[in-house]
């Protein structure tokens, strides 16, 4: 069996999940990988990448919201269309897609079945958290960003038959968990000044902030500015007292797996993060609208009363891969059976 796996590279979560899935898939089939999106990700990825397209990328304001004007102006939609037409999808038996538009749209236009495998796909289920009606347009955009005929989603709860629990990296599963008293902060859509403005008002707290703005670590009063590094981040996460993070699925999943208290600040206008944050709140977690002095008291209350969300993330990663492949084989067998049945009916 030959499989094409399209992976979105915005953030590190899609790559981290694909890394685990592909390590299992390659033991069962031949796998080609296509990336699209930014190239400056910090997750090590050993499997060969057949092609890395520019794709589509979201841009953000300095205060943690999607910058829609910049997103529209800085993406090259003509190049995107050419890449979609040129992408080879006919050479594969199975096409998997983690929110990656090139392989998804190429499959759609060339009448090839594409199976979604992403956190975003779970938002399309009617059985998950209900969002405000004002997000109806955002859901439509989400559906057509990387269209798929069917798929599997990931979330903190199995609220539908095709929803899995999060994929947890092997490196995270092996970590020794303790509490060294510091707090980890990961808010990639905020710039350093906005983060510093709030964190320095807690002088007794040791903050480790991971930011793409730094090429080398730097100490500034009680703030340790860290570069984005997979190993450093994982070790800091395992030994922290709590985590302040955006509502990105992977960081939240890993923090919950390690039983760390989380304070969640979703990116403004980002439907997936708003959805994730809503579920975190429903599970008893703390969510604030933005990082600002206005919300200082809520941050202080969270520090004084840390709460671990009770959740079991004990799913085996190979169970996900096996379910996908078994479903695919069953659907192919059923399709052949129906074809034979139709042929025999017409013949007789």
Q: Where is each model-derived feature located?
A:
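A nucleotide-sugar donor-handling region in carbohydrate enzymes
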Residues: 125-191, 210-212
């Amino acid at each position: 069996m030959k499989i094409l796996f399209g992976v979105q590279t915005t953030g590190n979560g899609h790559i981290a999940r694909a890394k685990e899935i592909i390590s299992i898939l390659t033991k069962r089939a031949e796998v080609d990988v296509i990336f699209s999106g930014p190239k400056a990700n910090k997750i090590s990825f050993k499997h060969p990448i057949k092609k890395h397209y520019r794709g589509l990328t979201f841009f953000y304001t300095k205060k943690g919201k999607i910058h829609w004007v910049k997103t529209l102006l800085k993406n090259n939609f003509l190049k995107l269309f050419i890449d979609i037409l040129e992408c080879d999808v006919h050479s594969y038996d199975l096409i998997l897609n983690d929110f990656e538009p090139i392989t998804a749209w190429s499959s759609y236009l060339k009448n090839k079945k594409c199976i979604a495998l992403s956190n975003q796909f779970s938002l399309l289920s009617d059985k998950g958290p209900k969002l405000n009606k004002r997000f109806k347009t955002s859901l439509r955009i989400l559906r057509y960003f990387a269209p798929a005929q069917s798929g599997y989603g990931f979330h903190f709860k199995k609220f539908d038959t095709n929803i899995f629990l999060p994929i947890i990296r092997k490196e995270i599963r092996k970590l020794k968990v303790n509490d060294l008293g510091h707090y980890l902060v990961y808010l990639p859509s905020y710039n350093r000044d906005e983060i510093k403005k709030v964190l320095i008002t807690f002088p007794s707290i040791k903050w480790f902030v991971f930011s793409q703005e730094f090429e080398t670590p730097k100490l500034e009063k009680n703030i340790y500015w860290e570069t984005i590094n997979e190993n450093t981040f994982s070790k800091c996460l395992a030994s922290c007292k709590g985590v302040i993070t955006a509502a990105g699925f992977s960081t939240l999943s890993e923090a919950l797996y390690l039983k760390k208290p989380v304070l969640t600040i979703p990116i403004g206008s980002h439907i997936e993060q708003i959805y994730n944050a809503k579920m975190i709140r429903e599970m008893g977690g703390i969510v604030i609208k933005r990082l600002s002095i206005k919300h200082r008291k809520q941050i202080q209350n969270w520090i004084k009363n840390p709460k671990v969300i009770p959740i079991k993330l004990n799913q085996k990663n190979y169970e996900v891969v096996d379910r996908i492949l078994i479903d695919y084989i069953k659907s192919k067998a059923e399709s052949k059976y129906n074809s034979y049945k139709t042929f025999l009916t017409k013949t007789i």
